[in-house]
Amino acid sequence: MKMNQIKIYLIAMIGLLVVSCESYLDTEPEGFISAGSPTVEGAEGLVTAAYAGIGNNDMIGPIASMWVYGSVRSDDAYKGGGGVSDVEPYNFYEQYNLTQPFQSWLAGLPYTWENYYRAISRANSALRTLNELTDEEFDLRQTRIAEARFLRGHSHFMLKVLFKYVPYIDENLSNEEILQTSNREYSNDELWNKIAEDFEFAMNNLPETQPQVGRANKLAAAAYLAKLRLYQAYEQDENHQVVNINQNRLQEVVDLTEMVIQSGNYSLQPDFAENFLNGYDNGPESVFAIQFSISDGTTAGRLNFENGLNYPHGAPQYGCCGFHQPSQNMVNAFATDANGLPKFDTFNDVELSAEDITPSGVTVDPRIDHSIGIDGHPYKYRNEDSYIFSNSWVRDPGVYGYFQSMKEQQAADCSCYKKQGPFMGVSTNIDIIRYADVLLMQAEAYIELGQQDMARPLINQVRKRAAESTGRTRFSDGTAPSNYQIAEYDGSNLSWTQDNARMALRWERRLEFALESPRFFDLVRWGIAEPTLNAYLEKEKTRKDFLNDAQFTAGRDEYFPIPQREIDFTKGLYEQNVGY
């Protein structure tokens, strides 16, 4: 698709979005029942609107899929598309060139900030109405309050991992007080605790199961609180460097994840593929997900369009736009040794191509064929000729290579798929927390507590499932497209010291969640973003010319800058992040 087509379409979208900072923080959702007339029906509608708020996503201000902010900014993926100038702000993020002037037609970060605060405003609107009702008037009042607080916690959490210091807005602030709330009202640790209060309330006031799918429950709140405490455990100084790992916070992570595990309400999907296929939404592995649907009575339906740029550009069934391409480093990371373990030290020595990834070629982790489109391999678990991935499907291989992301896409004949203009939307959910994440969060906490032996069986659960997930990746005759070799850690094939366990855990997270976006945030949490990403760039510069000037700057690039328009609007009340 030509650049001017993208601009025309997205300028029209922005026309619906651009409002003043004040209005998106204090405007009530459409259909809001005015103060003085709270009703149960009105409160229920506002809670529903708050759920919709966390999924009101778009390509110019993503809040559900973090592929731009978490994958492209890491060593997992390139921006892709039609060269570096195609959706240029995303190229700036990839290059860590984050001080470019505001581009009104396609800004990215400012609209992500805005969309999250719109979602927070919806949660607060629901809470204000619920607070005016009594338990006698509405027997589900406490449950709905807990749900709204969970949703508010989610949006504040995401803002925090993106920007670090953000204004905390709750339902008790007046419009005037909102305008006087600084993004530095709380210290880093205090802000974590403020956000945690919402998840703690939700955990203590929600049932373990809900009668309607998609609603937050007690265990989802416990899992999210565990995720927050894990991030908080890695204590940072003002320059974003990890200076301490808080053991008490790690123990909280163990206890909270154990609550989820022992409930028996969740398990790994039998086949890894089922996390990325239509028909398996809200399955046993989905702890909390953002819900989408193919039709809600509107023209476009309630579809996820945030990944609409990421389909194979040259595939006739799609036709656009070739973004979010796996990096060479990411592809290489799936290679395994003769024992079926990752090539921790040598994985990036050899540049793998489709000619290497064959039934008789290098041994690889099976998750490669769930994550990456490779020439000659079935795409999206379809083995008919029209879905065998081809190099001709890649939009700009001279810049970004021949691989394509695959997890977030769906087949063009799926009942979940709809093409709106040049872009693709799907109704499949976006998982925010999977059960695999719960297992690996607990494993990480155990390792950092010096109890790495407790972590090994947790990691092995994830690896065992990967080993058993090869049925859907095969050709029509039953043969595998790659030479799969993966083994569990038995304590002797890798000496299970704390350092080795940590290395194994971090590798497992990368492969399990490849191209799902956690990677950059993991690197920052662990305090290894600068050495990891600059080592990645040093090697990638020998492969990809467009990265020649890319450089990660420690003490700055761990977080995005506060959008300048927010600083201007608050007349300097908001402080810019260090380094910008």
PLM feature segments, named:
Residues 21-73, 556-559, 563, 567-580:
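Membrane-proximal, proline-rich intrinsically disordered regions
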Residues 284, 288-396:
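Glycine-rich, aromatic-lined ligand/substrate-binding cores of catalytic
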Residues 39-40, 44-48, 52-57, 83-163, ...:
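Conserved, well-structured interaction surfaces
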Residues 20-22, 77, 102, 116-119, ...:
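Long, intrinsically disordered, low-complexity segments
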Residues 160-162, 167, 210, 228-240, ...:
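Short coil/turn linking the two alpha-helices of tandem helical-hairpin repeats
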